[in-house]
Amino acid sequence: MHADTATRQHWMSVLAHSQPAELAARLNALNITADYEVIRAAETGLVQIQARMGGTGERFFAGDATLTRAAVRLTDGTLGYSWVQGRDKQHAERCALIDALMQQSRHFQNLSETLIAPLDADRMARIAARQAEVNASRVDFFTMVRGDNA
């Protein structure tokens, strides 16, 4: 099975943003076993975070972030990759394994419904909760025209 680029980007993003303990628990509950070899052992490094002034202005480097990457190959030759923020090497390897399994038609539907969709829903709930927390303390400023400034 060959997933289109946008679909693969979506599941890789969901995996990268997932909570390591939650991903491990959900994957273990599925009882999926797969023989694979590690092509690139999980390794940790730094990446520079780029931003833009006002979202559209000149690019600048906002700082550094720790990133861990991994690559695995299933026995049938399917390659799986992952890049996750932080230093959790097991999480990176687990994400790479799931990426490889998601590319196989026999696992795609099951993993999409029982792993990727719930992880995505959990992430959206975390984002919504954080947004609600921020909105609760939001202050909207406005300017009133005074009589002497009119």
UniProtKB/Swiss-Prot annotation:
In terms of InterPro entries, this protein maps to: Phosphonate_metab_PhnG
List residues traversing the bilayer: none
Look up the record and report any one GO term of the cellular component aspect: alpha-D-ribose 1-methylphosphonate 5-triphosphate synthase complex
Q: Which reaction does it catalyse?
A: methylphosphonate + ATP = alpha-D-ribose 1-methylphosphonate 5-triphosphate + adenine
The processes (GO biological process) annotated in the record are: organic phosphonate catabolic process; organic phosphonate metabolic process; organic phosphonate transport
Matching Pfam families, A to Z?
PhnG
Q: What keywords does the record list, in alphabetical order?
A: Transferase
Enzyme Commission number(s) of this protein? 2.7.8.37
Q: Record's superkingdom?
A: Bacteria
The Gene Ontology terms for molecular function here are: alpha-D-ribose 1-methylphosphonate 5-triphosphate synthase activity
Miscellaneous remark of the record: The sequence shown is that of strain K12.
- Please describe the quaternary structure of this protein: Forms a complex with PhnH, PhnI, PhnJ and PhnK with the suggested composition PhnG(4)H(2)I(2)J(2)K.
Family indicated by similarity = Belongs to the PhnG family.
- What exactly does this protein do? Together with PhnH, PhnI and PhnL is required for the transfer of the ribose triphosphate moiety from ATP to methyl phosphonate.
Q: What is this protein called?
A: Alpha-D-ribose 1-methylphosphonate 5-triphosphate synthase subunit PhnG
Q: Which organism is it from?
A: Escherichia coli (strain K12)
